[in-house]
Curated annotation (Swiss-Prot):
Subunit: Homohexamer.
Main localization of the protein described in the UniProt heading: cytoplasm
Top-level taxonomy: Bacteria, Pseudomonadati, Campylobacterota, Epsilonproteobacteria, Campylobacterales
Protein name: Phosphopantetheine adenylyltransferase
Keyword annotations: ATP-binding, Coenzyme A biosynthesis, Cytoplasm, Magnesium, Nucleotide-binding, Nucleotidyltransferase, Transferase
Species: Helicobacter pylori (strain G27)
Pathway, per record: Cofactor biosynthesis; coenzyme A biosynthesis; CoA from (R)-pantothenate: step 4/5
Binding site for substrate: 10, 42, 74, 88
Amino acid sequence: MQKIGIYPGTFDPVTNGHIDIIHRSSELFEKLIVAVAHSSAKNPMFSLKERLKMMQLATKSFKNVECVAFEGLLANLAKEYHCKVLVRGLRVVSDFEYELQMGYANKSLNHELETLYFMPTLQNAFISSSIVRSIIAHKGDASHLVPKEIYPLISKA
């Protein structure tokens, strides 16, 4: 059976921090599913279709990465792909508290599911989608925080 990991997120928009985690985690799996979440509760700046397109553009050089859109329980998506490992990033202590709860919740729904946590590299530790959204909302230049393939798409927002 193929070793498959899932890296879920809203990716509103995808950042260099996300791509760093995709790069490092894709080396651990035969296949990495990047699951772009619907996340209507977060009121995303970009539509699910736009976010999926951005992620596909940003990850096109990764041969073992597949991008999918999803709505619903992550534990169910993991079962659908026969995946036993979720990939998550941790930047700050508050991320850990939230991710720990989510990891336990996912484990309670799918007992085979483990969560693998990645710390960001130093140059990406401060980057978040919310920082990027704030910069572009105020007409600032966020090109150094996002993959070059998607900057033209987000700078129009």
